[in-house]
Amino acid sequence: MRKIKTKSIVVIALILIITQAYANKEPEQKDLKPRIVVLTDIAPNDIEPDDMESMIRLLVHADQFEIEALIATTGWSNTGNGERIDLIYDALNAYEKDLPNLMKRSNQKKFANDESKQEIGYWPSVNYLRLRTILGSKNMGMKFIGDGNDSDGSNLIIRMADENDERPIWISVWGGGNTFAQAIWRVQQDRSPEELKAFLSKFRIYT
């Protein structure tokens, strides 16, 4: 019960921190959503319900965040549940059913181009979110950071940092952070120290 409460507090705190950060931005940037990536070791409800609860909580606030990726990865203390990406799809199926009612909050009638920058109040299509739901690292520990350990998740993180977008990318770590660590390793190998520094400056990590 304490862990479930802690995870809920983390999600709420993330909402408050990002909201405050964007409240201090210049007016022309104020209407754009903050960009977020979720790394989750989501598990069945009978094993660890807090991850699914956090996913549902995030989706009912999807009009406040530009969800760049939902990445299924390992936990920090076990081999993880990267193969349970289907649980994220279950949450998205529920989101799809509720979406018509959720859109009424902002009188939204249609969906914008999925690749366009999203304004606060915009509800993303379930197709957009499904395309952004991918696998990250499947193995835990530093010995699995390096050659042969790139994943769809780590590659997407790199591509997002390369996009022409001044907004920082918030990485919310609900499980292990190895997918992000692998992205850092890859950039470190392939780019100059200055380019690595520029890459790292794009991110804000919240665990």
Give the residues covered by each predicted segment.
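Bacterial N-terminal signal peptides
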Residues: 9-17
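Sec/Tat signal peptide C-region and signal peptidase I cleavage site
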Residues: 20-22
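N-terminal acidic, glycine/proline-rich low-complexity segments
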Residues: 24-207
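Bacterial N-terminal signal peptides that target proteins for export
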Residues: 1-9
